[in-house]
Amino acid sequence: MNKEIIEVFDNTYPDRDYTIEIINPEFTSVCPKTGLPDFGTITVNYVPDKSCIELKSLKYYFLEFRNAGIFYENITNRILDDLVEACQPRRMTVKTEWNARGGITETVTVSYSKSKE
């Protein structure tokens, strides 16, 4: 997955804490064990610092996963790491909710918080 695709723009209100929620209800990847497609919803909540994520570039970043064989847990952590690196938010949470396979669903949530220096 090419994280260089992710673009950001300047936050006009860097002195204010506010939350941005981004939802992608059509995320797809491939199960690395079976080769079958996985479908899920990705929710990103973050409090920006100096920059915000540009949505068109994020869409193309998410499409990078479409043919990738990768486990749910790895997808969730990879997205968090890549988005934190791109926009350096104050706080961010990535939640992935996966459609049922064999009658079982899975939700993975991972968070980041910028340390006070």
From Swiss-Prot:
- Which GO molecular-function terms appear in the entry? preQ1 synthase activity
Q: What is this protein called?
A: NADPH-dependent 7-cyano-7-deazaguanine reductase
Give coiled-coil spans as residue ranges.
none
Pfam families for the chain: QueF
UniProt: substrate binding residues: I53, E54, L55, Y72, E73
Under the heading SUPFAM superfamilies, the entry gives: Tetrahydrobiopterin biosynthesis enzymes-like
Main function: Catalyzes the NADPH-dependent reduction of 7-cyano-7-deazaguanine (preQ0) to 7-aminomethyl-7-deazaguanine (preQ1).
Q: Which residues does the entry assign to the active site, renumbered to this chain?
A: C31, D38
Q: Does the keyword Lipid metabolism apply?
A: no
Name of the gene encoding the protein in the UniProt record = queF
Q: What's the EC number here?
A: 1.7.1.13
What is the phylogenetic placement of the source species in the record?
Bacteria, Pseudomonadati, Chlorobiota, Chlorobiia, Chlorobiales
Q: Does the keyword Oxidoreductase apply?
A: yes
Main localization category: cytoplasm
Q: Which GO terms describe its biological process?
A: queuosine biosynthetic process; tRNA modification
An example GO CC term for this entry is:
cytoplasm
Annotated metabolic or biological route of this protein: tRNA modification; tRNA-queuosine biosynthesis
> Which keywords annotate this record?
Cytoplasm, NADP, Oxidoreductase, Queuosine biosynthesis
Q: Which reaction does it catalyse?
A: 7-aminomethyl-7-carbaguanine + 2 NADP(+) = 7-cyano-7-deazaguanine + 2 NADPH + 3 H(+)
Q: Where in the cell is it found?
A: Cytoplasm
